[in-house]
Amino acid sequence: MSNESPIGAKTRATRRRALSPLVGLVVLGCAASATHANRGDIRIADTDVYPESVTSTSDGTIYVGSIKGNVYRAAPDENVALPWITTSEENGILTILGVFADEANGTLWLCSVPNFFGPERSQGVSSLMAFDLETGEQEGVYPFPPPASACNDIAIGPDGSVFATDTPNGRIFRLEPGADALELYGADPALVGIDGIAFAEDGTLYVNNVRTNEIFRVEQNRRGEMTGLTKLTVSHELSGPDGFRHIEGNRFLQAEGPIGRVSIVTIEGDTATLTILTDELTSTPGATPVGDTAYAIESQIGHLTDPALRNTPPGPFMLYAVPMR
């Protein structure tokens, strides 16, 4: 989530979108086959969306969460994302920060959070929610324990456990397979501002911090308990690191909203090296890999937070196709 909201929103609404050229970058391994290379940009077919997170499956289906409280889905090779799961009294979705497609378990996980920009849907408890990945039927609701929390992003561990970040309180929660409630996996003052979360192929957990502009490796013992954090040395100065998605091996896709940057992050030991794909987007809180393409969202959140833009209607809400090769 961007550092203009109470948990750290990001605004860069005056910048124009222009993709910088990417020369000589070869990415080994993709989230889907290269058959989606000609798909192009994707339009979200709705108004007042303000997308915040994006995820994808191996066939190229893309899912987008939004401040509006809806999940939008673009089927493989389609360039329009349509409302798929919509907020209702029955499902209790408030606004949506993180979304994550868990193909192994057939589940779409999302973070429901009280609406910072209310008054509609501004009351309630932040929760991790589960929906069937095929039908969109709600399967579970897992409220975050007090104090007031903000579930921000999600990752799946090697054993199928679900991990979710709590930005304002610096906590990571875990939902083990078959469990009916979240348990505290770890907490640390250095995690206040925690946002993106992802596992490497070897099972190592990494997180970023949208407030302190850092990336950490999460240390754990053989019992699977968090024992500490290791701050990584980063090749570039970060600005509001947000969505963090595993690509393959020790490579990740990271979005930074305030500077409109999407990068591949390669982690070797205690060093994280960024290969910049673009730094000319506007307030981009997330990106997801589909084949050789990163699909990046522009939130246009400034139209909710910037007095100069508040009475100006935003343009179309888009996912922009950024080459990863």
Name these PLM-found stretches.
Residues 38-44, 80-89, 137-144, 181-188, ...:
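A short beta-strand motif characteristic of beta-propeller blades
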Residues 46-59, 89-112, 144-162, 188-205, ...:
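Beta-rich, blade/repeat-based domains predominating
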Residues 75-79, 132-136, 176-180, 219-224, ...:
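Short loop/turn segments that connect beta-strands within beta-propeller blades
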Residues 293-325:
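Blade-level signature of beta-propeller repeat domains, shared across WD40, Kelch, NHL, RCC1
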Residues 65-86:
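Beta-propeller domains
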Residues 122-157:
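Asp-box/WD-like beta-propeller blade repeats and closely related beta-sheet repeat scaffolds
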Residues 47, 62-68, 102, 108-123, ...:
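Conserved beta-strand positions in repeat-built beta-propeller and related beta-rich domains
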Residues 70-72, 127-129, 171-173, 214-216, ...:
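A short loop-to-beta-strand structural motif that recurs across blades of beta-propeller domains
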